[in-house]
Amino acid sequence: MAALAVKPHVVVEDGNDDVSEVSISNDEESGADSDHEGADAENSGDEDGKSDEEQNEENPNAGWAEAMAKVLGKKTPDTKPSILLKNKQLDKIKEKEKKERLEKKKQLDKKRAWENICREKPDVVQDREHERNLQRVATRGVVQLFNALKNHQKNVNERIKEVGGSERKKSKILSSVSKKDFIDVLRGTDVAVKKEKEIKAEKSSWSVLKDDFMMGASMKDWDKERDEDGGGGEEDEREPAQEYSSESD
């Protein structure tokens, strides 16, 4: 706008002609200088605007980063609430929790190491026979347990049947059943099997080899055991003698 305004050249016919012409020429020169300065300012403003726009196009987050940097750069007193990122108390709490976790982990590792001092992993190749024996023992134990359960249930059912339809007596019998009874049954299964085996072994052996042989016999019965043992043999021996005598006759 300053460039469009042109001052007219006015000539005043007066005694001071030289002074008026000089002042007008000075005014024209100052107006031209101001026009040039205004144009330079507009050009520089346009260049600055273009440079800002170009920077924003190249890095659109630059303004946001500057704003956040200003906010974070402010120093806030301890009495006022601050951003959690700058809260030093929270950092101290996190550091304390981290130390506690590490301490607990060390204690657990120490405990596990103490428990695993004498533990060894079994070798399947070398300890194959030992493992088989253990499997057999475990199988026998399981079979014995289920047999004991079956016998215990059978005994309880028989006692309930003997009572009849009395609910009071049934409840009394069921309340009288305890763990001790079951343990006795569990122990008695093995004992009963051993006793049966011993009885069979004793029956198959010769009576002379028994521990109680001739313990309860009196002197007058000393030959009965011998007759019972060898009775069949004497009869067999006598029969051919009789046959021989009949032939001689």
Swiss-Prot record:
Compositionally biased intervals (Basic and acidic residues): 220-229
Cellular-component GO terms for this entry: preribosome, large subunit precursor
Keywords: Coiled coil
InterPro entries given in the database record: Rrp15 (IPR012459)
Keyword Lyase belongs to the record: no
GO biological process: maturation of 5.8S rRNA; maturation of LSU-rRNA
Amino acid composition bias (Acidic residues), ranges on this chain: 14-32, 43-57
Coiled coil listed as a keyword: yes
Cysteine pairs bridged by disulfides in the record: none
Residue ranges the record marks as coiled coil: 83-113
Family (UniProt): Belongs to the RRP15 family.
Full protein name: RRP15-like protein
Organism: Danio rerio
